[in-house]
Design a protein with these regions (language model features):
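Single conserved hydrophobic/aromatic residue that forms the stacking wall/gate
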Residues: 1-7, 11-12
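Short glycine/threonine-rich beta-strand-turn micro-motifs
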Residues: 13-40
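Secondary-structure boundary elements
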Residues: 31-90
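Conserved hydrophobic/aromatic pocket- or pore-lining residues that grip, position, or stack substrates
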Residues: 66, 70, 98, 109
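Catalytic cysteine-centered active-site loop
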Residues: 77-84, 95, 116-127
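Conserved active-site-adjacent core of cysteine acyl-enzyme catalytic domains
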Residues: 82-92, 96, 100-107
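Hydrophobic/aromatic-rich core segments of domains that either
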Residues: 100-175
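Low-complexity, Gly/Ser/Thr/Pro-rich intrinsically disordered linker/tail segments
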Residues: 162-312
């Protein structure tokens, strides 16, 4: 949905009727007039300050700049409700839920001249998805992509040392709807994945030997390796083969592999340690709650597929 510049003073509700081309916006003001003026002045100054270092960057770099700002500075928090759903939550308080984060992304990208709208999907209680979810669709180089800074933020925040994840940076429709529900209102078709982050950074592998080579480098240099697998479906059998190569690379450097997997997006994180610990695989699931769900299993105990993983989460 294109919401325009959603300011801190207004909450936009929408009503959409099946078989109707129209979407009805219903504004609800959260503060009195004086408070609204104060927030508008503060947010205008805040946005101007934040975008200043990024004004001469390319479209893709501007998008990454905004994404990284969210992941480095915003904590998911639904308790401050009047703030968390609006841009004053993320930009003024450093907190927000998916709605506030998506609005903040749009406001910042609008100010940087990058086309951006807000996308909303429905909930699905049968799958354990309690709430609607909000993210962004951006246009980079004339092509539309999905950008979900909230999901990347939840994946990166759980570790002792926060890291920025890019699992949901410029996805096409086929990728995003692996773990997002259908949209509740029309949005541009996203049919390209050329600007997907891991592909741009040459971390999207189609060959198993590339996984082994990069894992060996990570074990040798003590660096974290995060990569995307696009050499076919990430089935249990394929994942087992990749894990064996990751283990082999660690054995050659006397290191133990600690692996985490965002299964629906086929993104694998590998970190090697000198400690004598049992090899394990953490199955991650990004979501719009305060923390993402995860299940820790041994290398030999992989579930059959991602649906099996989701069943374990629901239990």
């Amino acid at each position: 949905i294109g919401s325009g510049l959603v300011g801190s003073e207004m909450c936009i509700r929408d009503r959409y009727y099946k078989d109707s081309p129209n979407l009805i916006f219903i504004p609800e003001y959260l503060f009195d007039k004086k408070k609204i003026c104060e927030h508008q002045k503060a947010m205008t100054a805040r946005v101007e300050k934040l975008i200043r270092p990024a004004q001469k960057l390319s479209e893709w770099e501007k998008e990454k700049y905004v994404h990284d700002f969210i992941c480095e500075n915003i904590r998911y928090d639904k308790l401050k409700k009047s703030y968390s759903h609006e841009i004053i939550g993320p930009l003024g308080q450093g907190v927000g839920v998916c709605e506030g984060i998506a609005k903040a992304v749009k406001v910042l990208l609008d100010a940087l001249g990058v086309w951006c709208v807000i996308a909303i999907c429905g909930n699905n209680p049968e799958k354990g998805i309690k709430y609607r979810h909000t993210w962004n669709i951006v246009k980079i180089g004339g092509t539309y992509y999905h950008l979900d800074a909230t999901f990347d933020n939840t994946l990166g925040k759980d570790r002792e040392t926060s890291e920025i994840r890019y699992d949901y940076f410029n996805l096409d429709d086929s990728q995003i709807f692996r773990d997002h529900e259908p949209l509740i209102a029309p949005a541009p078709h996203c049919g390209d994945h050329e600007h997907f982050y891991y592909k741009e950074k040459k971390l999207s592998f189609t060959k198993k030997e590339d996984v082994y080579k990069r894992s060996l480098q990570a074990a040798k240099k003590g660096r974290v390796l995060i990569f995307h697998w696009r050499g076919g479906y990430l089935t249990k059998e394929v994942l087992k083969e990749l894990l064996e190569l990751i283990r082999k690379a660690g054995d050659e450097k006397d290191k133990t592999a600690m692996v985490s997997i965002n299964w629906p997006q086929a993104v694998i994180r590998v970190q090697y340690t000198d400690m004598q610990v049992q090899e394990s695989v953490t199955i991650e699931e990004a979501n719009e709650e305060e923390q993402y769900d995860k299940a820790i299993i041994l290398f030999e105990g992989l579930p059959r597929d991602y649906e099996d993983v989701r069943n374990n989460f629901r239990e």
